[in-house]
């Protein structure tokens, strides 16, 4: 019997119509009844995956979720963060300068919102906030500091502008960060140590489940 089942969302949990089939739903309910932990693993924040967790009844005490492609592990019901492989203010400064040099925009993903270092959000930041049911917070650059939980940092803009950014990224940044073009208008930067494998290991250690 499986003790823990980790599921990606797109292409695994959801079909081509972005829906959960009855077969998948029933399989997850059976697994949960058998005592297995069913854990969704996603690039989204917890608010962005909460509707799916509710639909699948994966919102009880003892249910967990892996967010931001492994950067964050959370308890679903309490929202308590169990593991966080975050970035820092120095990372923001570096990536924000890269965005400025290429005349593009940047936002910071925290567990609960999007932070922008400008007054008016880019349309793609609005798209991300709407998609994930989170607020946009505008801050002055000088007020952004290490009190913020930097889950990931994104450069966002028109696809052709992001192509230029990719061409201009110094090679050493590809060694320093995990850089993902998650959509034509999204370029994500994550801590190099953040991935779904390390997140699962952290979760298993937290709940005393042998790997």
Positions of the model-derived regions?
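Core-facing hydrophobic residues within beta-strands of well-ordered domains
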Residues: 2, 60-62, 150
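Asp-based phosphoryl-transfer active-site loop
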Residues: 3-18
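Conserved strand-loop elements at the edges of beta-sheets that form or border functional pockets
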Residues: 7, 67, 75, 181-182
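Conserved short-loop catalytic and cofactor-binding motifs
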Residues: 12, 37, 80-83, 150-153, ...
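Short, solvent-exposed loop/turn segments at secondary-structure boundaries
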Residues: 17-20, 85-86, 191
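Short phosphate-engaging motifs
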Residues: 20, 45-48, 161-162, 196
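Active-site phosphate-binding/coordination module
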Residues: 22-123
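Conserved acidic, metal-coordinating active-site core of Asp-based
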Residues: 98, 102-211
């Amino acid at each position: 019997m499986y003790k823990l089942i980790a599921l990606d969302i797109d292409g695994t949990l959801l079909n081509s119509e972005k829906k959960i089939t009855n077969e998948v739903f029933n399989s997850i309910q059976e697994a949960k009844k058998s005592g297995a932990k069913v854990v969704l693993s996603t690039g989204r924040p917890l608010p962005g995956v909460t509707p799916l967790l509710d639909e699948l009844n994966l919102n009880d005490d003892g249910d967990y979720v892996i967010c931001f492609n492994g950067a964050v592990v959370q308890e679903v019901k309490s929202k308590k963060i169990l593991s966080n492989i975050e970035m820092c203010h120095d990372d923001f400064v570096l990536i924000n300068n890269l965005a400025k040099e290429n005349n593009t925009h940047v936002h910071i993903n925290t567990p609960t919102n999007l932070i922008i270092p400008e007054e008016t959000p880019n349309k793609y930041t609005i798209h991300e906030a709407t998609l994930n049911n989170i607020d946009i917070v505008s801050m002055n650059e000088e007020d952004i500091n290490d009190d913020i939980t930097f889950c990931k940092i994104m450069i966002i803009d028109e696809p052709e502008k992001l192509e230029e950014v990719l061409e201009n990224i110094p090679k050493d940044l590809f060694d320093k960060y995990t850089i993902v073009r998650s959509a034509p208008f999204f370029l994500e930067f994550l801590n190099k140590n953040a991935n779904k494998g390390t997140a699962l290991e952290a979760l298993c250690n937290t709940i005393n489940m042998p790997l």
